[in-house]
Amino acid sequence: MEKIFQNVEIKPFLIDFSNPFIKNAAKRLFQLEEQLPLVPVNVVMDFKGINRAAVHGLSRVLQDEIPNYMLDIKPGGYKIEDSTDLFMTEQFIRNRINFIPIYAKNETLVFALRSLNNSCEVKTIYSRDLIQVAGPKLKYPIFNPTFEIGFLQPGKSLIIEDIYIKKGIGRKHAAFNLAVKTHFSHLDIEQYPTDKKEYMALSGYKQSSMTSDPRHHRLGLCFPAVPLPHINQAVRTYLKNACRVIIGRIQSIQKIYENFEEPQPELVLFSMDEEKTKAIITIKDETHTIGNLLKTYIYEMIPDISFVGYQCVPHKQEMVLTIIHKASQEDLITLLEKSIQNIIQTFQILEKNVDELIA
């Protein structure tokens, strides 16, 4: 397979200190005279020679199906007698703390917020007011000091203990999203010229991407908190980890059918008639991301297949893959294995390309 990952553009969002207004505001509000330790980084990538499902799968995993971290408050972490309003702390302050973008690798860190407003004016509480109370000493900040957490009226206080680092995935809580603002387009579908905008579809394509088979794609996204000195290293790690997550989830499916001749609850395999075989595979805690990959790659491997489809069953937290084809049970499993190997190979090559493109 040719090189999949064709090009990458990495652009950090930096404060424009050459602008006097921005420079003065940064110094007045946050005593900043240099760039923040963490910066949002926009990444645009071009891929060639793969189907839409692979790019869509990478996009989905990078955004909300890969483990990441957020700040959260442990039960009992509020000092009720000292805090302004427990309801506001739970519904407003906690939400603000959750969504502070962080770059964390150590889950043993604990922070606290102890703020008192002795002035006659409303006081703004920022993330810089969080203090570390447990865990190893930080060599580098894990969040920027500039995020608004809340406001204090004169004479009021806000005391929150046990603000800890929690691990999870974005599809269960948006604060865990590793990447944001993901979007992708197809570069090999003819588009309307810009001077014909009044005639074009909203997508800009002359042919619907739903009925075409694009093989040249552009994926864009933003990582909201990347250490300024290690931008390329962090982006490379994120992309490689996403490939490994997909490979790992696909490989777990192989275990379901590797001993297909033995009865097992996750696999139902039977002959419908003298020619057709039907396979029903139940995969626990799986999503449309993997379902779409399997469906697309199986179709590419078996163009004359009778049927392949999947259904996510939310209340059971499982995905059901159904395949019907004119083949023996053994041959059908062999074709499924070849399809899965193609998915694994795609993301192994993509992972290798990441190392080649991002130094």
Swiss-Prot record:
InterPro entries: RBP11-like (IPR036603), RBP11-like_dimer (IPR009025), RNApol_insert_sf (IPR036643). Pfam families: RNA_pol_L_2. The keyword Aminoacyl-tRNA synthetase does not apply. It comes from the Viruses. GO terms for molecular function: protein dimerization activity. Induction: Expressed in the early phase of the viral replicative cycle. GO terms for cellular component: DNA-directed RNA polymerase complex; host cell cytoplasm; virion component. The keyword Transcription applies. SUPFAM superfamilies: Insert subdomain of RNA polymerase alpha subunit (SSF56553), RBP11-like subunits of RNA polymerase (SSF55257). Keywords: DNA-directed RNA polymerase, Early protein, Host cytoplasm, Transcription, Viral transcription, Virion. One of its GO terms (biological process) is DNA-templated transcription. It is found in: Host cytoplasm; Virion. Component of the DNA-directed RNA polymerase (RNAP) that catalyzes the transcription in the cytoplasm of viral DNA into RNA using the four ribonucleoside triphosphates as substrates. In the N-terminal section; belongs to the archaeal RpoD/eukaryotic RPB3 RNA polymerase subunit family. In the C-terminal section; belongs to the archaeal RpoL/eukaryotic RPB11/RPC19 RNA polymerase subunit family. Part of the viral DNA-directed RNA polymerase that consists of 8 polII-like subunits (RPB1, RPB2, RPB3, RPB5, RPB6, RPB7, RPB9, RPB10), a capping enzyme and a termination factor. This is DNA-directed RNA polymerase RPB3-11 homolog. The lineage of its organism: Viruses, Varidnaviria, Bamfordvirae, Nucleocytoviricota, Pokkesviricetes.
